[in-house]
């Protein structure tokens, strides 16, 4: 347990920061899940919209050092690949 007043204050500050970071990370994770649900439903407009929001939120998390940049890059890359393959499949069906 902290004995100095400054250490006690830092414990409170860290708890607040942790909660904010959890909310931001959760928001980014939820957009990724919404993208995957739109992919499963086959809704292209919703996929594009949620992809943009997910990408934006992941980049914000990287800038605030909530997640590592390589983790965000990997997730964005995988979502972009899924979006591209979905688009190619739709074009192949149209032909």
Swiss-Prot record:
UniProt record similarity statement: Belongs to the bacterial ribosomal protein bS20 family.
HAMAP family, A to Z: Ribosomal_bS20 (MF_00500)
CC per GO annotation: small ribosomal subunit
BP terms from Gene Ontology: translation
Record key words, sorted: Ribonucleoprotein, Ribosomal protein, RNA-binding, rRNA-binding
Transmembrane stretches, start-end: none
Native organism: Ehrlichia canis (strain Jake)
GO molecular function, one term: structural constituent of ribosome
InterPro entries hit by this protein: Ribosomal_bS20 (IPR002583), Ribosomal_bS20_sf (IPR036510)
Keyword rRNA-binding: yes
Alphabetical list of Gene3D superfamilies matching this protein: Ribosomal protein S20
Keyword Oxidoreductase recorded: no
Highest taxon in the source lineage: Bacteria
Protein name per Swiss-Prot or TrEMBL: Small ribosomal subunit protein bS20
Function recorded in the entry: Binds directly to 16S ribosomal RNA.
């Amino acid at each position: 347990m902290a004995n100095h007043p400054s250490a006690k204050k830092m414990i409170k500050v860290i708890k607040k920061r942790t909660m904010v970071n959890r909310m931001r990370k959760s928001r980014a994770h939820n957009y990724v899940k919404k993208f995957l649900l739109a992919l499963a439903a086959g809704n292209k407009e919703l996929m594009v919209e949620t992809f943009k929001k997910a990408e934006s939120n992941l980049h914000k998390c990287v800038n605030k050092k909530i997640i590592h940049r390589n983790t965000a890059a990997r997730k964005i890359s995988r979502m972009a690949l899924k979006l591209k393959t979905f688009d190619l499949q739709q074009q192949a069906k149209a032909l």
